[in-house]
Amino acid sequence: MLVVWQKLPKERMRENDKENEREHVKRKIWSAAAPGNKCEERERCKEDEYIQYILAYSKLSAGSIAYSGITATRVKINMVTNDGFGSTVL
């Protein structure tokens, strides 16, 4: 059996890095939304954390994300992508 290793083109490697970073930030959003997060000023701190991760995610996405509200354990965002408009609850 002959195994040939081929290097990925640099552009493909960059896409993989961007996708990995996007997944990392998405996990951070979910962990920020998890009940039981501890903070001195719990609600305000949670809100700041949500917004921080949502903004980071929007920079990594092919579109724009607008923060539109927080409930006790969920963040609602509106995401406009190249395909159209959608609303996502994280």
From Swiss-Prot:
<protein>
    <recommendedName>
        <fullName>Uncharacterized protein YLR379W-A</fullName>
    </recommendedName>
</protein>
